[in-house]
Amino acid sequence: MSLPERPGASQAYNQRSVYRNSPSRRSRPVDIETGGYHAVDNQASHQRGKSGSSFAESIGINSNTESMPLSPTSPDGQSRHAGPEQPISRKRSLIRPERNRIDRDHRNYHYHKHAAHMNVLPSSTGNDPIYEDFEASTERTNSNYNEGGSDGSPRQRRTVSGDHEKSAAVASTLPTPDRTKSGKIKRKSRRHSKPPKRIEEQLRPPTFWNVYCAIVTFWAPGFIMKCCGMPTRAQQRAWREKMGLISIILIIMAIVGFLTFGFTATVCGAPQERLRVNKVDGGNMIFHGVAYDLSESHHPPAQGMPLRSDGLGPNVLYDLPEKNAGKDGSFLFQNVNGRCKGLITLAKGSDVPTNDDGDLAWYFPCKTFNQDGSSKVNTTTPYYSGYGCHTTLDSRNAFYLDLKGAADVYFTWDDIKNKSRNLVVYSGNVLDLDLLKWFNSTQVDIPERFKELRDKNSAVNKAIRGRDVTRMFQSSSDKKYAQCFEEIIKVGSVDTETIGCIASKIVLYCALALILSVVGVRFFLAIIFQWFICRKYAPTKTSQSSDRRKRNKQIEDWSEDIYRAPIRLPGDVGSTVYGSSDRSSKRASFLPTTSRFSSVGGPDIRSQGGRRMPTTMASQSTSNQLLTPNSMFKQGNDSRASFLRTDPYSSTPTDGPGPAGFIHDAVVPQPPSDWMPFGFPLAHTMCLVTAYSEGEEGIRTTLDSIATTDYPNSHKVIVVICDGIIKGQGETMSTPDVCLGMLKDHSIPPDMVEPFSYVAVASGSKRHNMAKIYCGFYDYGKNSRIPADRQQRVPMMVVVKCGTPDEASKSKPGNRGKRDSQIILMSFLQKVMFDERMTELEYEMFNGLWKVTGISPDYYEIILMVDADTKVFPDSLTHMISAMVKDPEIMGLCGETKIANKRDSWVTAIQVFEYFVSHHLAKSFESVFGGVTCLPGCFCMYRIKAPKGGHNYWVPILANPDIVEHYSENVVETLHEKNLYLLGEDRFLTTLMLRTFPKRKQVFIPQAVCKTTVPDEFMVLLSQRRRWINSTIHNLMELVLVRDLCGTFCFSMQFIIFVELVGTLVLPAAIAFTFYVVITSIINSPPQIIPLVLLGLILGLPGLLVIITAHSWSYIVWMLIYLLALPIWNFVLPTYAFWKFDDFSWGETRKTAGEKTKKAGLEYEGEFDSSKITMKRWAEFERDKRSRSGYWGSRENVIGGGGQTWTSPPGHQYNEEYYSDA
């Protein structure tokens, strides 16, 4: 918890303060995620005054030094070293400058702002960094929240009417403080300073979204909305935005419906009736490739067409001597004198009628022929005379104008390639070259090319028969022949589709391929993760069975009841039997593992395979690299180092300083850093339990499960944060009283605990809140279900948000929401890591944790977040920390949540398989890419800080200023922001992590299991899923804009997130379309195969997942129940959620005594007076505390005295249980 030293104020290396050398406070110069530090040329030599021998002497030292710049580049992008004579030149780079511009939209903007205030200069000599002195360089000040340096200034927020922060106005009017020679702060007179003015809401131009929502809801003016129960502007704005979102959802649904049903009908249209050749029945007759229905026709009176007895003309199909049913009559209506004019000429002695222009009356004999091409050329029987060729104007008008074709005759390519035929294709038309044989050479003359093409024995005919000759006949002469053939020997068209129909099929098959690929890839990658990837995160052994099937059966039995305890397996690793795992490993090693050449403290711990073990805060402290001789983080390789607290302010090097007072005499001793009972280095972990209105039974269940996990108690601490003085519905005690009843051996008597101020996540006067800190050890109670031999000693801290005295008489005093509870701890961790100014509450948290754990809070690098109604499986914490330690790139993970009340009602029954699929299919697939989009707040884990690069370098993750700043946003105005911050804060934290660190991983650990109770009433489920669905939609909207996620284009997490977003929005339409397809497939014939196959795959693959992953066969039954409830999941719940977009309350869940369900949001009332909140660094708080108490580091008040030897506190001798053969 230290910052590097500012230049020009350093002391000798062996005299540096122990407090400023935390390994977590260093950052690599080339750290990608921090932006890095740049070298400073011509840096001055580092000198500083001599440090006093005691703390009382040290405060008299005045170090009036100026802070040199952090880097050559200032936050605004301008060089700090470039003078007038030194122009700024831009170097060549493959990266565009706007990519490196750190503006307010940059994901690391706030981190750079904090890094800019770090007092450090990078080393240009290769030596260790020079750190700020603990005694002399810290300014002594009694400044409140609105005074002092900018590094600890309150988080700036947007201001709205009724939410004025006095700090902003006061800061603008206060003069800059001057420091006198005596070291005191001299301020100018404030007599003439103007009082702070109220900051009104600034008028901003309407955005495109606001204009769109206003257009959509133009029919609902403000006065009508006031009459309908929406009097405030915020309610009206939320309702208008809701209607805007609903309109967009309806548009998307309409687009999906159009693509599903209307696109094909639009672009392809109703297909024209088509008849395949040789399938034209007897009621039709073919003319030039078109079938005409002549079954009810009558030929008008003409020569050779006698009238029937009924006075009507004969039917040409049945009444004539030659039956023409189903035949081709193209020669009866020949297309003459068109493109064939000049090619087909009159022969000598021909009796074909002609005129002066050379036009011919007919080309072929006016006879019919069979459609299959089997008719032979008849050269003996005379054909009909001219009247059979229909050469009169009346007959041609009757055919071309009055007669309508019934269907086109088409040929398939198999028909065209039939060797018995002589067919070719030109421009989609089928031409029968055998019809060229019907030319009578005595009547007409034809070109030799015609004779060559019709001859099956010619080379040309063999080359073109059965093929498409469109491209081949592009020459001028052949093209002329082909166009002539289209008029005289066309017998049909090739079996083709229109461009629209082709486009429709392309869209259909592309969508099919996309859906199948997404569904298939998700399934197979989920299987790969379950079988292979997740196993590399598992520890070598835990307290539970290592057999996978046996363990799954044990978990299923355990999850049947929320209060059922797991089976205890004898002989396995257990936190109550120290050294049980070490005994076998120690005896198995016959040869010595160290020698006189081994490094002291074992800084280079390696696994059995020779690979370097992962870095943790505890493991790195065994190395002296980059640590000053008297570093507070220099721990010995034994258990004594955890509670060793000598005088921090003596002039001689001693072990690290602690808070004034004492370290609890019952602190859990720290094991040696190389003690690895589970096969990986242990990491210190905080277990955060957020409580609101839960009762004693629920909280006891959660804390019992955490306290009895097999992870060593020396490396875990329970932190319970009670969100206000709340009494749950039907409870006799308030939640804070319940939590305090589970705490014993208090470091400070409960009646002596005072409330301390902090900045809450709220608006107006509620930004000032107060809370009490209680520290001690977990109390299992007199009637505990946990056996006495398993009741371990676990350090515990309870934070009770009690509110300010002004709200003591109001309902829910101190209540600020779950996000505020999380921010209390997250902001505290950020202040600890960056050594920033902290509030009084955070100072008490720091000291309280140190007293009950024996180590600095800076040691904690992992945080487990659990709701107060969740029970954790005994080895779950071990599995989760194992994954964190083995893969430093993992920044967040979650386990599987089981349902404990499966059989309470039909409402709980339909949720069982939904929980299973969401974990083992969705989260397993996302884990392959390290991009789990939702870490459930009821059971998840985040990394506070991560080791980076070389030894002793750490970067903030959850404690990153960008995470804390965005997550603690106190002014939410738009509907989108309210759904993010007020309904789905847990999911939004996951989104923030992915958005800030897109290259790091968030995974699912299936071995880590918890169980919880789910809603057993439909209205409660409806309210819960309304919050979850709306939160999911708005978080996916945020994630879809993150461009740096894994993959590219369609093969990326960004694309998968987009598909999930669209899929969530169209759920009601999708289930309606599904039922429509199923019903039409049953009624109509043939059924729609492709949609039914897709439906079967989507619904059936999860069942196959149950079989492949070897889970309980009972999940098949739960799957069938889930399928029956699909209309509820996909229609009722989403539709209700969409209509409730503007409802920001928690509905029927978590109701308190006397509470009525109402729409909620951030309430703006009063003004925030920041002067009531004191902000100082830990060193300043500690100095003031010691000044008031008169404690100046006397040897008798600190464990260990002032010498170089140490004495253990009462009841704690050397910790021999970690080594069984010690």
Swiss-Prot record:
It is found in: Cell membrane. The chain crosses the membrane at residues 205-225, 243-263, 513-533, 1055-1075, 1089-1109, 1113-1133. InterPro entries: Chitin_synth, CHS4-like_dom, Nucleotide-diphossugar_trans. Residues 11-24, 42-77, 616-630 have a biased composition (Polar residues). Residues 182-196 have a biased composition (Basic residues). One of its GO terms (cellular component) is cell septum. It is a multi-pass membrane protein. It catalyses: [(1->4)-N-acetyl-beta-D-glucosaminyl](n) + UDP-N-acetyl-alpha-D-glucosamine = [(1->4)-N-acetyl-beta-D-glucosaminyl](n+1) + UDP + H(+). Coiled coil: none annotated. This is Chitin synthase 4. It comes from Gibberella zeae (strain ATCC MYA-4620 / CBS 123657 / FGSC 9075 / NRRL 31084 / PH-1). The gene is CHS4.
